Regions:
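A short beta-strand/loop micro-motif in the catalytic core of glycosyltransferases
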Residues: 69-70, 97, 131-141
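Carbohydrate-associated surface elements
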Residues: 142, 161
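N-terminal pre-catalytic "stem/leader" segment of glycosyltransferase-like enzymes
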Residues: 1-76
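Acceptor-binding helix/loop patch of EC 2.4 sugar-transfer enzymes
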Residues: 97-126, 177, 227-230, 239, ...
Length: 260
């Protein structure tokens, strides 16, 4: 029996792509090696940005190879490119799967990329992707209900994959007076951070700052090459919101995220 050929078209190697595409497809191929073959690309149209050239549709190696074209979010070459991948997949007779874990239509103003989406009409491009895809997958039911009017064929709710290959030690209970609490929020969502910054102030006040130690992880090391970009600007803004909750003496640490 011929293997099912899946072309994974990813935007980057960040959390959105990793937990929605890269990790689950890798797991699927490991579990079903005799039934599934997976390829990965971030440029299925094979464009040459420097020359602004691309092969004709019948010469696109990966697109013609695939049975399923699996696209997630807006790709790195922009909204029109993403829409073209969806359209090209349909033109070539492929089953097109579009996944998103962020509400790209009717984006709220506190989203860090609100102006980018508005100025580039990415909400309209996303509606095109929803309408033309054979399958649209999202992260939760509330999300699904909000975009239902734009879906022409099939939609499913799929939670983020759990990466079982990551270490998951069962730490022994400590007798120390500290209680460890984990918090995770995306840097694109100012609203999350603005809500959270009241919590450190409240906890420090209730139990005493001498009994609490806060540790924040994920801040990338300074990168001079990204000076002036949104990536360089978002972290100082993120931390300024977050640290407003700390009044008085410092009882927190900020840890840079170092590559493995």
């Amino acid at each position: 029996m011929r293997k099912l050929k899946i072309l994974v078209v990813y935007a980057n190697h960040g959390g959105c792509s990793y937990y929605r595409q890269l990790s689950p497809m890798k797991m699927m191929q490991e579990m079903l090696p005799d039934k599934v073959e997976v390829r990965y690309t971030d440029n299925p149209l094979e464009i040459n940005p420097e020359k602004n050239e691309a092969p004709p549709p019948d010469k696109l190696k990966d697109m013609n190879w695939a049975d399923i074209v699996f696209v997630a979010n807006i790709l790195k070459f922009g909204g029109p490119y993403t829409a073209r991948v969806i359209g090209m997949g349909k033109e070539l007779g492929k089953f097109v799967h579009f996944d998103t874990d962020d509400l790209l239509t009717g984006l709220y103003e506190e989203h860090h990329l609100y102006d980018t989406y508005k100025d580039n009409k990415l909400d309209e491009i996303t509606k095109f992707c929803y309408y033309n895809a054979d399958l649209v997958t999202v992260t939760q039911m509330k999300f699904a209900h909000r975009i239902k009017p734009y879906i022409r064929k099939c939609m499913a709710v799929i939670k983020n994959v759990i990466d079982y290959s990551l270490p998951a030690w069962n730490h022994p209970k400590t007798k120390a007076k500290f209680t460890r609490v984990g918090y995770a929020a995306g840097i694109h969502h100012r609203g999350d951070v603005k809500v959270f910054n009241a919590i450190p102030h409240l906890v420090n006040q209730k139990v005493g700052r001498e009994n609490v130690q806060w540790n924040f992880y994920g801040h990338p090391p300074p990168d001079p090459s990204k000076k002036g970009t949104w990536e360089a600007q978002v972290w100082p803004e993120y931390m300024s919101h977050l640290l407003r909750g700390f009044k008085g003496g410092k009882n927190y640490n900020i840890h840079y995220a170092l590559p493995p």
